[in-house]
Amino acid sequence: MEAKKLWGGRFEASLEEWVEEFGASIRFDQKLAKYDIQGSLAHVKMLGQTRIISQAEAQVIQAGLEELLEEYEAGKLVFDIRNEDIHMNIESLLTEKIGSVAGKLHTARSRNDQVATDMHLYLKDTLFQVVDKLTNLRQILVDLAQEHVETIMPGYTHLQHAQPISFAQHLLAYYNMFSRDSERFAFNMQHTNVSPLGAAALAGTTFPIDRQMTSDLMGFAKPYSNSLDAVSDRDFILEFLSNASILMMHMSRLCEEIINWCSYEYQFVTLSDTFSTGSSIMPQKKNPDMAELIRGKTGRVYGNLVGLLTVMKSLPLTYNKDLQEDKEGMFDTAETVLISIDILAGMLKTMTVHKERMAQSTEKDFSNATELADYLASKGLPFRQAHEIVGKLVLECSKAGHYLQDVSFETYQAISPLIQADIYDALSSKVAVSRRNSLGGTGFESIADQLKSAKEEIQNAKSL
């Protein structure tokens, strides 16, 4: 039996089946079922309170919706593609349950404000989850940094050894990135926590609705102040996709480093077996597949952002069917981000850090060259002159196959009488790191200050 279209009064002919399938969205927008029912519950309570429909009718509709919500949460609802989308599927199921009175639910409402409301509710839930998971990830980074304040590793520029740094500082750099991500998602909430319900198709309604009431019932901060904006706004989704893209970029950067660190050439870390895979042909392989997948999925999230920006770029006010394309990218991004945060957190929490290997990699390089230049500058030599002297010495050492700490004291004295026997302490990677205590620097005192601030920030985040 063909499902009757709720909008069918205007039409003499029905859609062909293949056209209907092209236009239907129930395949993916069924993810909004819970939120669609929640929005309808708020709407029908308001309709009853304002006497737009009778209290008795409102109670019957409310009871039917509550039954549908229970059935949905139990996985018992079955949706029909002939009902196009989640809104018409829910209304059809409600009609089967309580009869024609279900038709009064849509009084003073359009699918335009209905779908916008559903997406605001969905994204609110998602934002809370993302921020909560980011707080956990930041906590793991802080805990790991606390363990490795005095773990020395090479700091890189251009992927070349630059200066020795504390591994804790490297981790805290990512902590800061994820903190900014949390702030962006929190700000995103301001534009998401607004109710479109009651805007109707675009121009509002002649019924004496109470939009503040429905907004409050759904837990929104306020209703939209302009009905045209309410049904056509997708900025809140674009902000989410943009913020998610930046977050994925940060996670991808860290994953790239983890991939390098667990390679044979680095051997800085070993990933847990629970976050690694093997090879079907090479029995020795232990591959960082999960880190690689996060890196790969980053491009997918970027694509979702560009996709929706492109959909929106020429849309006139207000609702256009193009906006059906706003959902799949949002759902995909939300699911990708949430699982990626969990995977990265798990990798960091279970990986083994090889402190000795990290430290050794700073001993057979020239990353202490800046220390020698700074040493000479601290003795009164102009830094540019010191830079020139050290550069030439590095060249000579490179040709001779040894390092700055191998140069004899006599040779140093010949280079400059300003150089004293304490030069060898200054060239030590650990000493070099410990002394850089400028604000935000890699020195141990500076790291302690950074950790203190980070712990306070996390405590505040957990108390919200």
From Swiss-Prot:
Pathway: Amino-acid biosynthesis; L-arginine biosynthesis; L-arginine from L-ornithine and carbamoyl phosphate: step 3/3
Main location: cytoplasm
CDD domains membership: Argininosuccinate_lyase
GO biological process, one term: arginine biosynthetic process via ornithine
Molecular function as annotated in GO: argininosuccinate lyase activity
GO cellular component: cytosol
Coiled-coil ranges per UniProt: none
InterPro entries: Arg_succ_lyase_C (IPR029419), Argininosuccinate_lyase (IPR009049), Fumarase/histidase_N (IPR024083), Fumarate_lyase_CS (IPR020557), Fumarate_lyase_fam (IPR000362), Fumarate_lyase_N (IPR022761), L-Aspartase-like (IPR008948)
One Pfam assignment: Lyase_1
Enzyme Commission code: 4.3.2.1
Entry keyword set: Amino-acid biosynthesis, Arginine biosynthesis, Cytoplasm, Lyase
Domain of life, per lineage: Bacteria
Subcellular location(s) of the protein: Cytoplasm
Catalytic activity: 2-(N(omega)-L-arginino)succinate = fumarate + L-arginine
UniProt similarity note: Belongs to the lyase 1 family. Argininosuccinate lyase subfamily.
Protein name listed in UniProt: Argininosuccinate lyase
Gene that specifies this protein: argH
